[in-house]
Amino acid sequence: WQAGDIAEVQPGNSTARIQAFMQKHHIAAQSIVESLAISIEQALWDKNLNTEIEPFANLEHLLEQLSPLPTREYSIASVPTQQVLRLVVRQQQDSEGELGLGSGWLTQHAELQQPIALRIRTNESFHLINDNRPIICIGNGTGIAGLMSLLHARTRLDYTQNWLIFGERQREHDFFYQSTIEAWQTTGMLQRLDLAFSRDQAEKVYVHHKLREQATELKTWVENGAVIYVCGSINGMASDVDAALIEILGEEKLDQLR
């Protein structure tokens, strides 16, 4: 993969969920699906078990009624030269305490050392420029993942004109990759760092506030050829950041950068 690419993860069902489904439908443990030569537990791991089931004559007929669980996409936080694929996953829960499909699988249901089924999706629109122009990385929450991959790639090329603008809730708990980011500052690999921790003061501060605070510097970087990368929540941050960039740079200039 390249910096900026996406991991499409295939979530699975927890052992408890599979066992409950089998008990409900009176399926004996370790029953073999003859056509697949695997156990029914293995066959059910990636199936949508919320499906309404019609009476089935055999396990093959049962499986024909079950669609696969949908995949979940995560920005990759590392580059191949690190020899590890890193994701940043926030565990999600609904109002009834049910864990999110992807986050529940990755943070709780999958066993340690268990292989994770995923494929890489090329994300060309977020790939790194192939020269040493400055870059401005803007993001919030788990969006730090995609930005970290870009910054890791830049540091390996000794490109130092990098600016990170990042927002989260609390510095104490939510400053992801703090030691790495601070080390980059110390070594000069990260020329600028602006942080917006919304819950650390009475008046909430977000990424778009930091952009407006640094409007003059932002315009200078863009005039010097900087490329802007934005990674984070579509609901909220993206529209606020877009509005701030239009206000600072003008709509025509921003369109040229897209």
Region locations from a protein language model:
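FNR-like FAD-binding dehydrogenase module
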Residues: 1-258
